[in-house]
Amino acid sequence: MDGGLGFKDLESFNLALLAKQWWRLVQNERSLSHKVLKAKYFPYSTLHQAQKGSKASYLWASLLEGKRVVEQGANWRVGDGKSINVWNDRWIKKPPDFKVHKPDQVQPTPMHVERLFQNGKMEWNKEVIRELMGEEETSLVEKIPLSKNGMADRLIWKEYVLGAFLIKSAYYEARKVLNKGNWDKSNRDSL
């Protein structure tokens, strides 16, 4: 619905702005805001694993709603493979969810992408990949270029070639989140 001031949907726009703040926290773990939030809300985990908790401030609860947009609109770029969970994270070019799906015979054990590399090398271990995945996903994984210098894995914004976060595309991701019912009434009322 268009408003008279050119705003299409204020709730989606607000959610996109919260997503931008979450994106900044993800991209700059050395920032003062990241350090303060880590000390208070996720001292023993990573930002990606952070939960709301029972004593969440309005700010923290709002940022976690922005996280939902980032999770839908971002993918991982493989670097050293230490941060990406093979089964749970978005890292292969396979819409709609960009995730590897476990074949029935594979046990769902936590595994990071680095376990798919040759021992001591930045090359795919094709035997291990073929053992764990279906033909289509094996082909997609083997096409992913690997860093020769072992850079860290990086979260990139999927809608933009350079991987930079854009409010415009975050707005459309926020609309998807809201329309799917992922932003349920209980979350809105608690903010």
Model-identified regions with their sequence ranges:
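A helix-boundary/hinge signal
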Residues: 1-191
